[in-house]
Amino acid sequence: MGTTTMGVKLDDATRERIKSAATRIDRTPHWLIKQAIFSYLEQLENSDTLPELPALLSGAANESDEAPTPAEEPHQPFLDFAEQILPQSVSRAAITAAYRRPETEAVSMLLEQARLPQPVAEQAHKLAYQLADKLRNQKNASGRAGMVQGLLQEFSLSSQEGVALMCLAEALLRIPDKATRDALIRDKISNGNWQSHIGRSPSLFVNAATWGLLFTGKLVSTHNEASLSRSLNRIIGKSGEPLIRKGVDMAMRLMGEQFVTGETIAEALANARKLEEKGFRYSYDMLGEAALTAADAQAYMVSYQQAIHAIGKASNGRGIYEGPGISIKLSALHPRYSRAQYDRVMEELYPRLKSLTLLARQYDIGINIDAEEADRLEISLDLLEKLCFEPELAGWNGIGFVIQAYQKRCPLVIDYLIDLATRSRRRLMIRLVKGAYWDSEIKRAQMDGLEGYPVYTRKVYTDVSYLACAKKLLAVPNLIYPQFATHNAHTLAAIYQLAGQNYYPGQYEFQCLHGMGEPLYEQVTGKVADGKLNRPCRIYAPVGTHETLLAYLVRRLLENGANTSFVNRIADTSLPLDELVADPVTAVEKLAQQEGQTGLPHPKIPLPRDLYGHGRDNSAGLDLANEHRLASLSSALLNSALQKWQALPMLEQPVAAGEMSPVINPAEPKDIVGYVREATPREVEQALESAVNNAPIWFATPPAERAAILHRAAVLMESQMQQLIGILVREAGKTFSNAIAEVREAVDFLHYYAGQVRDDFANETHRPLGPVVCISPWNFPLAIFTGQIAAALAAGNSVLAKPAEQTPLIAAQGIAILLEAGVPPGVVQLLPGRGETVGAQLTGDDRVRGVMFTGSTEVATLLQRNIASRLDAQGRPIPLIAETGGMNAMIVDSSALTEQVVIDVLASAFDSAGQRCSALRVLCLQDEIADHTLKMLRGAMAECRMGNPGRLTTDIGPVIDSEAKVNIERHIQTMRSKGRPVFQAVRENSEDAREWQSGTFVAPTLIELDDFAEL
């Protein structure tokens, strides 16, 4: 007997029959079994008698020699999504569960794990004090490093001038043309208060730089002032701005060189020799951010291969612990490195990772997989696990992985890595860092409305986490080679004491960043006889040109400039050293005494839910990189697909169903999402009467009570998010990310308008209009639909809602939620139907006192004409609030980072299949960057996947209906016939191609124009 993954026991013959049948229809046995179960369940639910089992499973049918032609498969919505949910082991499930757990819970668990025994704590504090004291009292660093350190210390990110310098450093080096560079300099320098920095630093370079920036700032800010003398104008005109440009350019390049070991791997290896002679080791990183195109990924792959060859030869047999190594960024090796593209990552990225690792093994140099954003952690663990069980890598201990102490999951990740090392019979190199993406993790969680942060909101909690994790790593020396990356003297000293005095080569190592940590580790690496600690330090050494430096440089500037950074604080002589090297466990306990609870989050960093303070709640999102959330969503989607969705007119009194029309999924014509019936003229008349009769009752309802009802509706809508997502995906062709955003926006509208009338709103001063007609679009069938209605209801108006013809089902659910929340049935009514019939009857009725419309400019103009001649009882025009389309443009000059431009263009132009009124239509590029930008844009477009939005992998869904598809394709063909270059490309597989033929899909399209007149 065998057991399927669904737990169904089958004899071997039946299993073979299922396998054979599944192969004939190009499906998996697992899919076929689930399909049979779903079909049988549906028959049971719709029948009073027990249906016979399908022949395939009952054994009633025999296989013939010639396979019959399979019948057309019934469409099962969201089955593909369900098949993409990944099984998890106990240890992996624990990691996921800790993703965004409350800080109070996480920190309380960490404290005891991080606490140092009293003798160790005392020794660690003493050593940390000595290290910090020497670091602070040593002579100012000489040469380039000292200049940059002084400049960064003086111009911190808390000042306008510091921000200006960071902006310059981030952008200036990539701008190819002088005019744009001059414009950027004027923008960033002219408003700085540079005088305030004169004389504050003991560094001659910093003071000279300040005087230069002051003079530069005056030159720039007064360049166009009428009071400036002609002679000064001539000086500036002839040499001023070029001189400024050269000076600032030199300063920025100086700053860049501070953090980069060399522009090429050969140069970096040569530059490393000096510190290698002192006992330092190196791990080289080829600079660059995430690949956006296949060409980017291939270029990074070649760069890593060349680097491994060069590093391997330079290692000359020193081995993984004593010799140099390499660090690789997985997002550089694949343009779609994300959970949503899991299968592609495993099929395409993994072979590249394996190839690089085998090459590193050939030279016996360590290869570390760098840590990136939090949502990529778990997919990186899957890649690591697969790598660890490769037969060709058996017995080799050079595989390394980076973990981030600021992540709440970090201790559990270590437990998993220890287990992985045990199962794969190897010793893993684990680099423990504090984390370099803190700002973006906080912002992303806030923007996406997630339940919490993946990282700690207080730096001291990260320090506690680091110690707890360090103890875990040191406890299993046979399984883990710990690599402690820190610039903090107390952390360094604590690890030194915890590891003990019986150090042996290969026990552990420290690590630091090139350009930041060398002064501290000059005291650590070297012989005891020379006053050193005789512990190895490996320098993380970025390699690349100044043009590839940008994002890395910003992270380093943020790290240096943060007022909680040890690197920043050590230079602040007003800060006592005892405070600088305080034990973080003690510091957290003091905080707990002051605040009454352990682990409270930073008071100035509210949870995403509380982002807007007491005014209103932030809407809750859904994390599509969280395996537990995906499993929950999958279950809800399958259940949603079994519901019989209907959109009937929803009046004060119930109506008969009558003859109904199917609502078809635009991505899959075989999928009938539900049924709709258009409101009859008589029902529209009844609704108008009810709206008039109920208007005074709703107006008399206190604003605070109206607000409470809208708040309840928001809570209800949020609780039903998953089933609403299911309708939006099938009825409106929304991708999952779009559908989540749609529900969130609707919830936000309800909270927002409730907040507007809850406090400072009185019936005496804010009188309603009366019955208001709300006509909403299909591109935001829940968000704009809800927003219009919520605004009208909050102000005390009765509402007649006509949804778009294409999306009545989601509108019906929105109205049902409002009614459940307490809006009286006659106050809000749903009238599905066409604009020519239902819409015309509503807007043409004299009892209507206001119209809210979102849609085309053409229809808005018609509405304006129709109601312009009508006046209300007080002789005022009937208000029309119309939101229409436009021709949206993006203007890009050469100061813009090309990668960011491409990301933004893809999101604005092609997200929602380009069907937003705010969607990008015209991209205007500066000549100097046009070719490069277009090349990258085409490559990124080719990586997008267009298909059924019911799959997690889909980036671009269908346009709303066949009429829209025909109109768009006609325009594209017209441009082709005029000789305009047209580019269309998406990633294609056989399943997508079949869908494109039946669904209403239009590939993302780029058309090159010479003139706006061609639009």
Predicted ranges, named:
Residues 1-10, 19, 23:
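Short Lys/Arg-rich basic patches
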Residues 28-51:
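Short, basic amphipathic alpha-helical segments that act as recognition/interaction helices
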Residues 43-67:
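Short, positively charged interaction helices/loops
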Residues 63-618:
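Positively charged, amphipathic and often flexible ligand-engagement surfaces
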Residues 292, 359-363, 374-388, 395-401, ...:
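Long, K/E/R/D-enriched contiguous segments that form extended
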Residues 531-533, 543-544, 548-551, 555-689, ...:
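Terminal low-complexity tails and localization/encapsulation signals of metabolic enzymes
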Residues 729, 755-902, 953:
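Rossmann-like NAD(P) dinucleotide-binding subdomain of oxidoreductase/dehydrogenase enzymes
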Residues 820-822, 844-846, 850, 858-1012:
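ALDH superfamily catalytic-core signature
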